[in-house]
Structure formats: structure tokens, C-alpha cells
Swiss-Prot record:
Belongs to the bacterial ribosomal protein bL9 family. The keyword Transport does not apply. Coiled coil: none annotated. The gene is rplI. This is Large ribosomal subunit protein bL9.
Amino acid sequence: MQVVLLQDVVKLGKKGDIVNVSEGYARNFLYPKNLAAPATESKLKELKTQKQTQAAKKQKEEAEAKALAAKINGLTVALKVKVGDAGRLFGAISNKDIADGLKSQHGYSIDKKKIVLKEPIKNLGTYKITLKIHPVAQADINVEVASMD
């Protein structure tokens, strides 16, 4: 018996997959728990249209992310901070500070989780930072850390 999975089922398949199962397994386990539905013609058509819309949406998101990455790539964000005697910062510059600087100086709102810092910036200078905007798109920006003086 063929069924369409409505949710991910361990050792059976992922949501939207069409799988063959025994009638008893489908009737007694999958249907009562709303894990699957019978693979009827209407259900298969509905599934096909859902997959097409998801593919189109994914393609659109990838295109938007690549366009944003192209715009952001190579930008410079200048941050002015308080500095101690030895040229070390009071505190550190985190990915949130970089995201705020990118928004205030260039108008691009990037989630701080997408900014990749190996460790917080604690010294003056220019740093090359990677932004992972999307799994298929990333951009590099320069962060200039200068003294407030």
C-alpha cells in the first residue's frame, strides 16, 4: 500500500515522500497518528504543486541572497571604541557590534548569527570578516577598529 508521509518518520522517510508500507502498519499506526495519508491522485497532485512552490521559493531566496552578498562584498565598517594604554580595547567587538555598524553605516540589516567571528576582536586594526548570508552565498567585509581619541 502506498502512503504519503505527512511528517518525518524514523526509518521510513521524510515529509512528502511516497513509501510502500503494509496495510496494517498504515491503518493501525500511521493514519491514527497523522503521520501519513493514503496516496490518492488528489494527494499526489497536491504534493507535486507543494514541491514546485517550495522549489521556486528556495530558488528565489538563493537569488536574493546572492544579490545581497554581491552588494555587501568588500564594504568597510568603521568602528570607534575606547582604548586602554597598550592599545587594547575596553571590552571586545562582537558580531552584534559589527551588525549594528553595517546597518547604521550602509543600511544593510544582517542577523548577527550570520557574522562569522573566530573570536571577539580585542585589538585595533583592520579585520576581514565573513558573512554567511545563505548556504550558497557569503560575503567578506572589512572591519576597521579605531580609537575614539
